[in-house]
Amino acid sequence: MRPLVHLYLFVFFFGIFGPGTLWAQAPPRGTTTGDSGFLEQIFVEPDTFDVSYFYVPNPKVLISYDDTLLSNHFHQPQPSRGQGIERINLGNVGTPQQQLVFEPVFRRGYDIGLHQFDGYYLPSDSIPFYVIDKAFTDAAFAQGRTQQDQILSVDFSRNFGPQVNMSIDFLRINHAGVYKNQAAKNTALGTGFWYHHPSGTYDGYFTFTHNSSFQGHNGGIDTSSVTTTNRSEEGTVPVLLEGTKMAFRGVGADAAAETRYQKQEVAYAHYFRLVGPRENQPRRRKRKKGAGPPPPSTEVPPPDTLTGVDSLEVTALTDGTTEVLDTMVRTDSSAQIPPPQKVRRPWKREFLVFHKISYANNWYKFSDISLAADSAYYGRYQVHNQGLRHYIRERVLENTFRIGTARQDGGGRTASKNRGKLEVGLIHRLIRLEQEPVPTQTLNNLLLTGNWKFAPTPQIQLLTYAHYSLLQNIGDYHLSGDLQIDLGQLGVFEARAQQQLYAPSHIQNRFYVTESLVWERDFRKTFETTLAATYRLPQFGTEVGGQYHLINNYIYFDTIAQPQQSATVINVPQIYIRQNFSLGVLHLDNTFVWQFSSQQDLLPLPTLYGKHQLYIRGRIFRKVMLARLGIDVQWNSNYLPNAYQHLFGQFHLQETERYGFQPIIDLSLSIKVKTVRAFVKTENLNQFLRPNDFIFQTPLHARPYFLIRFGLSWRFLN
């Protein structure tokens, strides 16, 4: 075990202080945070890797760590790609992301308004805690064209005696950029300790997260200066922000314009069981050597052929306060154990008290020290001739209290009939906000929360969640309900309704550059309503669904990157179809999305989106090796995508760059031997189809030319 302890120390200290040139495939992230949506679900085969984990907000829902197969996203290690609908970035790996398909973002109280790096970050509620008998490690590494285009991810967990478990979740993205003055380095580190009392009446979770981004900006390609000569290599293509030579946190970029964003949080959460059945464990029974805390009195998700994130679960549960829809596969070895004899026990009512205290320290800084070359780029935002600077910092002390009750039997199992759970809570957030040059502000958020789970039969589940804000954000609220009906051989039907009212973010209301006020607004609150329905037929690889979004008082950034509020109602209907075909070893997976924005000039969206994977998968070399050879194609229809203003980290409207049908084509080969997986792939094959054109997804920010990327993943128990 000594090498694994060394690995933990290396990841912990290197992730925070090291210069790092590493990158890898991110491990399964939590389903309790984020703003991804109804297409984040993927059809995969069940697996047999006997490791399960859970998240602190939902400790009774065990999820199988079942991704040792060659899934359809293993060869796509970038966080913006992989499962579900892909997001678009600035061409460079690790850069700010925006949606291609509209999804509402969960809002709860005060929001600073900086979300361009959310897809790379790990919130404390998304740290997985593992139920294991042996130490567990999952390490993955991928590299692109150079040693400064790398990704590293590490999942590690081990037990310290029968009551304590430790978990580490680490992701590092490092890319020096292929065009001039580019750089991107993102780090997400989460570590946690779980203590379980032998009586089962107390569980405590200590977590620490460190998320950071360092970005060098070139403003995009100067298309007016591109010639046949200077476009032969990415490094000679002219860019809008030439800047001056400077070291960039060990990455070595030439960027004078840079962004630094750091979020750190330390938290302690604990559950008290006040009334209810204790764990049914013989006192004299010796636990297996190396065994850690037993799993909490768990709800075993019902069998299904889908794993990962549910299609309607994500947007409902981004707050981490409600339980996920139980559609995860339980594929561990316990499925082979004969079921125990049924014992009639009296039903009992369990009462749980939850408390969490956390402290977060977040700061964001942009600076450009070379305005002599960049003055034309910033226009009205260049308020000072010596340089530009934007700095904002928030420190948040948060306390969460919840009390809940659930009906259980005497053995600690959730009741299989007429089972239900009711929970009410209170959240207080004390926020200290620093923004140059105004004095420090103190804000208070107080939220009343509640959620109710009702399952009259094992085939029907209803989940509801609500919160209401008091004090500074008084009047903000969120209501949501999720219904799931398991129709057996006829499939699964899901429906969702959501409504929320929320105040503008801080950046939308007020912004300073180099201590000069650029804008100050008094926007009305935004009102959103979402209705969704999905029908799945897993045995045929079919899923059909739709969503309807209604947005009032929508806030956007106009063509000069100024915040504005729409006086008209925006409607966004969406229909999607996912259909997977297979014939022997030949597979074809398809996703189609149709969406329509009633105000394309305010909320531009591509009307059509498609994602296709054609591949051959089977065992070779006397069935010892599993191999997958395939091609991935992603495309969207013609539209005006939002541009990016790195000065304050927001995407904004533009009217000059319209991008039509330009598919992104990748060819990949993946192999697996036992628990070791590897891949090699070629990216941007369409460069050969259009050798004289740049590939843009975000205006002026081109994707790299043709390149080869390889990766390796190894997971083991020891």
Regions from the PLM with identified roles:
Residues 1-29, 681, 705-706, 711-718:
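Bacterial Sec-dependent N-terminal signal peptides
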Residues 250-301, 305, 311, 327, ...:
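Exposed, low-structure sequence patches enriched in small/polar residues
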Residues 310-311, 318-320:
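Flexible coil/linker segments and helix-coil junctions enriched in charged and small residues
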Residues 103-111, 121-125, 133-138, 158-162, ...:
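A generic short-segment signal for beta-strand/edge and adjacent turn/coil regions
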Residues 1-2, 7, 21, 25, ...:
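Generic low-polarity alpha-helical segments
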Residues 25-265, 272-301, 305, 311-312, ...:
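Membrane-proximal, glycine/serine-rich, low-complexity loop/turn segments characteristic
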